[in-house]
UniProtKB/Swiss-Prot annotation:
Entry keywords, A to Z: Aminoacyl-tRNA synthetase, ATP-binding, Cytoplasm, Ligase, Nucleotide-binding, Protein biosynthesis
Sequence positions that bind ATP: 217-219, 226, 482, 534-537
GO BP, one annotated term: aspartyl-tRNA aminoacylation
Domain of life the protein comes from: Bacteria
Main location: cytoplasm
Pfam families attached to this UniProt entry: GAD (PF02938), tRNA-synt_2 (PF00152), tRNA_anti-codon (PF01336)
EC number per UniProt: 6.1.1.12
Protein name stated in the entry: Aspartate--tRNA ligase
Location of the region described as Aspartate in the Swiss-Prot/TrEMBL record: 195-198
GO molecular function, one term: ATP binding
Species annotation: Escherichia fergusonii (strain ATCC 35469 / DSM 13698 / CCUG 18766 / IAM 14443 / JCM 21226 / LMG 7866 / NBRC 102419 / NCTC 12128 / CDC 0568-73)
Length: 590
C-alpha cells in the first residue's frame, strides 16, 4: 500500500512518485489549495492538493485530524522561502495526485493542542501513542533492545527463556498467583525475576546467559514502578564481581554512545558506606555537588540535647549539609524544608546562615547559635568549607533517619536552587552493601535477596556475626536512579542453608520452598554471578522522561489498573468454578 514512509522523504526523492499511508496530523484549507501535514511512525511530511487535480482536492476538503489516508503524489523541492528548518522533511513537499480515505475519525477524546490528563492518555492509549514524542520513545526502546541483543551475542551470551508459570519463592514482594485448573487448590506464581532459573542454568553449564524478560511484583507502586516490568537479565559462571561489572559497564556505555552520542567514560566505584556517609543515599546523584559532613565529634559536649544526644549515641549521627548561596533562602523556604525532612522521620531542621564569616558570631544567623560557642561554630564552618552567603543545614537523629532526611533534602535543594547540573550524566557503581538489614521485628532480612554471597566470610563466620556481613553485591546508578543490580551468588549448599537459617527459614521450609535448589547445589555447582537491568528505567533515562509509563506501550496506573481495557476485572463464575475458587465478599463496616 505504501512505497515510502512520510518522515523519510528527502531531497533525494525529488521527482519521484510515492505512495504514502498514515494519518492527517493537521489540515489547512486555503480555498484553491489544501495543505495537510501527513504523519506516520517515521515523522511528518507536508502534502498539498491543487486545482489541477480536482477530484483529489475535492476529497481533501473532507479531511479532518486523524483520518487514516493513502496519498499518491510527486515529491517536489520547496522554494527557499518555504523551507521549514524545524522539520526533517522541511525541504520537500508532496503534490498529491490521488487520495484515498481509508477510515474516518470521530471527534477525538484527546486534544493535540492542549495538555491532556494522564488518565485520558491511558484510557485512549492507542491515540496517545500516535503522538510523535510517544512514537519516538517506543522506537528508542526498540533500538535499545536491538543493541542489547547484538552486544550480548557478540560477547558470547546465550538468549535462553525461563518459565513464566513457576513456584512462589520469597523475593521481597508479593507474588501474582495463577490458579491451576488441573491441580485443584494449587497455584503457580508469576516470576518476580528469573533468579533461581538463571542460577540453575549456570549449574547446567551455560556459562553466559541473558534474557529480556517480563517480571511481576504485586507491590505498592511509585511513579517509577509497574506491576509488570521488563528486565535485561544476565548471569555468568567463572567470572568475578569486577569482571561482571566490566562487561555490564561496557554494555551501558555502548547504549549511551549509540542512542545519545555520549561517552560516559569509566564509572567510579563507591562503597555503600561511603555513599550513605557522603550523600545520604545508596543511589547518589553525583550531578549534585553537595555532600553531607559529619560533625558529631564537635558537638558531644554542647548543652543542646538535640545535637548532644545523637552525637554521643553509637547509633546516632549529626550531619551538616552546606548549601552554596543558601543564605538567600527566606524564612518561609526554610520552614518548608523543615516540614519536608519530617516526611523522612526528622524532628526538624537546624541551620546556620553564613552572612560574613570574618565577623564571627555577628556574621551568622542561627536559632541554635545560642547553644554553641564561637569555637565550635568556627570548627563547623571550617569543616564544611563554608563561605559568605552559604547556608548550613543540620540533621541529628539515628543514622537511618539522618541519611534518609538529609539525603532527600540534598536532592530537593539541589533541584530548587539549580545546583544540580541536569545537562550531565553521572554513572557509578555502588558496592559492598550490608548483607542483612533489621526487619523491624527483631530479625534480619536480606538487603538484596537470599541467594547473594557474603564477601570474604565462611559459613561459620557468617552464622556467628551476620550483622557484620558485607554482601558481594553491586548496583549501577545513573543520575540518582538505580538502573541495575546484581551480586555474586552462593554456590555452596552449607552457605545457602546458613543464610536461610539467619533469615528465619527453618529446614522444613527450606526443603519445601527451595529443595530443588539445595539439591542442585550438591552436584558440582560453579561459582557464578549476575546482574539485572531495568529496561523500562534505562529507556526512561535515555529518552529524557521522568515517568516510566511514557516508555511502556500499555502501562498500568499507580493503582495497577489498565484504564483502556479495564483490567483487572471480575472473572466468569464458570471459570472460577473450574478453578475451585469462590470469591468471598467482606461485610462492610457500618
Amino acid at each position: 500500500m505504501r512505497t515510502e514512509y512520510c518522515g523519510q522523504l528527502r531531497l533525494s526523492h525529488v521527482g519521484q512518485q510515492v505512495t504514502l499511508c498514515g494519518w492527517v496530523n493537521r489540515r489547512r484549507d486555503l480555498g484553491s489549495l489544501i495543505f495537510i501535514d501527513m504523519r506516520d511512525r517515521e515523522g511528518i511530511v507536508q502534502v498539498f492538493f491543487d486545482p489541477d487535480r480536482a477530484d483529489a482536492l475535492k476529497l481533501a476538503s473532507e479531511l479532518r485530524n486523524e483520518f487514516c489516508i493513502q496519498v499518491t503524489g510527486t515529491v517536489r523541492a520547496r522554494d527557499e522561502k518555504n523551507i521549514n528548518r524545524d522539520m526533517a522533511t522541511g525541504e520537500i513537499e508532496v503534490l498529491a495526485s490521488s487520495l484515498t480515505i481509508i477510515n474516518r475519525a470521530d471527534v477525538l477524546p484527546l486534544d493535540s493542542n492542549h495538555v491532556n490528563t494522564e488518565e485520558a492518555r491511558l484510557k485512549y492509549r492507542y491515540l496517545d501513542l500516535r503522538r510523535p514524542e510517544m512514537a519516538q520513545r517506543l522506537k528508542t526502546r526498540a533500538k535499545i533492545t536491538s543493541l542489547v541483543r547484538r552486544f550480548m551475542d557478540d560477547h558470547g551470551f546465550l538468549d535462553i527463556e525461563t518459565p513464566m508459570l513457576t513456584k512462589a519463592t520469597p523475593e521481597g514482594a508479593r507474588d501474582y498467583l495463577v490458579p491451576s485448573r488441573v491441580h485443584k487448590g494449587k497455584f503457580y506464581a508469576l516470576p518476580q525475576s528469573p533468579q533461581l532459573f538463571k542460577q540453575l542454568l549456570m549449574m547446567s553449564g551455560f556459562d553466559r546467559y541473558y534474557q529480556i524478560v517480563k517480571c511481576f511484583r504485586d507491590e505498592d507502586l511509585r511513579a517509577d514502578r509497574q506491576p509488570e516490568f521488563t528486565q535485561i537479565d544476565v548471569e555468568t559462571s567463572f567470572m568475578t564481581a569486577p569482571q561482571v561489572r566490566e562487561v555490564m559497564e561496557a554494555l551501558v556505555r555502548h547504549l549511551w554512545l549509540e542512542v545519545k552520542g555520549v561517552d560516559l567514560g569509566d564509572f567510579p566505584v563507591m562503597t555503600f558506606a561511603e555513599a550513605e556517609r557522603r550523600y545520604g543515599s545508596d543511589k547518589p546523584d553525583l550531578r549534585n555537588p553537595m555532600e553531607l559532613t559529619d560533625v558529631a565529634d564537635l558537638l558531644k559536649s554542647v548543652e543542646f540535647a538535640v545535637f548532644a544526644g545523637p552525637a554521643n549515641d553509637p547509633k546516632g549521627r549529626v550531619a551538616a549539609l552546606r548549601v552554596p548561596g543558601g543564605a538567600s533562602l527566606t524564612r518561609k523556604q526554610i520552614d518548608e524544608y523543615g516540614n519536608f525532612v519530617k516526611i523522612y522521620g526528622a524532628k526538624g531542621l537546624a541551620y546556620i546562615k553564613v552572612n560574613e564569616r570574618a565577623k564571627g558570631l555577628e556574621g551568622i544567623n542561627s536559632p541554635v547559635a545560642k547553644f554553641l560557642n564561637a569555637e565550635i561554630i568556627e570548627a563547623i564552618l571550617d569543616r564544611t568549607a563554608a563561605q559568605d552567603g552559604d547556608m548550613i543545614f543540620f540533621g541529628a537523629d539515628n543514622k537511618k533517619i539522618v541519611a534518609d532526611a538529609m539525603g532527600a533534602l540534598r536532592l530537593k535543594v539541589g533541584k530548587d536552587l539549580g545546583l544540580t547540573d541536569e545537562s550531565k550524566w553521572a554513572p557509578l557503581w555502588v558496592i559492598d552493601f550490608p548483607m542483612f538489614e533489621d526487619d523491624g521485628e527483631g530479625g534480619l532480612t536480606a538487603m538484596h535477596h537470599p541467594f547473594t554471597s557474603p564477601k570474604d566470610m565462611t559459613a561459620a563466620e557468617l552464622k556467628a556475626a551476620p550483622e557484620n556481613a558485607v554482601a558481594n553485591a553491586y548496583d549501577m546508578v545513573i543520575n540518582g536512579y538505580e538502573v541495575g543490580g546484581g551480586s555474586v551468588r552462593i554456590h555452596n549448599g552449607d552457605m545457602q542453608q546458613t543464610v536461610f537459617g539467619i533469615l528465619g527459614i527453618n529446614e522444613e521450609e527450606q526443603r519445601e520452598k527451595f529443595g530443588f535448589l539445595l539439591d542442585a547445589l550438591k552436584y558440582g555447582t560453579p561459582p557464578h554471578a549476575g546482574l539485572a537491568f531495568g529496561l523500562d528505567r534505562l529507556t526512561m533515562l535515555l529518552t529524557g522522561t521522568d515517568n516510566i509509563r511514557d516508555v511502556i506501550a500499555f502501562p498500568k496506573t499507580t493503582a495497577a489498573a489498565c484504564l483502556m481495557t479495564e483490567a483487572p476485572s471480575f472473572a466468569n463464575p464458570t471459570a472460577l468454578s473450574e478453578l475451585s475458587i469462590q470469591v468471598v465478599k467482606k461485610a462492610e463496616n457500618n
